[in-house]
Design a protein with these regions (language model features):
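Anionic-ligand binding region
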Residues: 186
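N-terminal Rossmann-like NAD(P) cofactor-binding subdomain of oxidoreductases
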Residues: 1-183
């Protein structure tokens, strides 16, 4: 399975780290608009949250790619999904962690077989949460994995609902700022 990752912030980077050593998956390219590939090694090695695997040998190539051990991964630089030529790298699955392509129509611009959104959609794109409703997946080309908050609370609520009734619920989520949010330092 050949994967492309669109967006390389906290979610995209975490997905990259988790999938890199999966033998069933080949990460062929990541799209990081405005990113200098020469910083990729520093970006991966210096993460105070997710420690990278110290056995990784990261090298930068001259063709806008880098290697992690023997795996070659291209770095793309485009905000327009319709201009990303994922097919050039034989990519058939794109994991979109940008939060920018949140409708089936906009996700279709990736022009690949399957797209997984890492945010809740803004239309009726189906949402699947593992251990909640993933068994309802029926081959849809474009899906959403909902939000990180939903992925945290939905399995807990499902467990409670299997044996109890919930009249109402309240929870608080504390979330890191995202790239699109302004941080006020007063």
């Amino acid at each position: 399975m050949n994967i492309g990752i669109n967006g390389f912030g906290r979610i995209g980077k975490t997905i990259f780290i988790q999938l890199l050593e999966n033998k069933l998956v080949n990460i062929k390219a990541i799209n990081i608009p405005g990113f200098d590939i020469n910083n990729i090694k520093i970006y991966l090695e210096n993460d105070s949250i997710h420690n990278y695997n110290k056995s990784w040998n990261i090298t930068i190539n001259e063709d806008n790619s880098f290697n992690v051990n023997e795996k070659k991964i291209y770095v793309l630089n485009n905000r327009d999904a319709s201009l990303l030529n994922w097919g050039q790298y034989n990519i058939n699955y794109v994991i979109d962690s940008t939060g920018a392509f949140l409708t089936t129509d906009s996700a279709n611009k990736h022009n690949v077989d399957y797209v997984i959104m890492c945010s809740p959609p803004k239309d009726n794109t189906p949402q699947f949460i593992y251990n909640v409703n993933h068994e309802n997946y029926n081959g849809e080309r474009i899906i959403s994995n909902a939000s990180c908050t939903t992925n945290c609370i939905a399995p807990v609520l499902k467990c409670i609902l299997e044996n109890n009734e919930i009249e109402n619920a309240s929870f608080t989520t504390i979330h890191a700022t995202t790239a699109s949010q302004n941080v006020s330092d007063t």
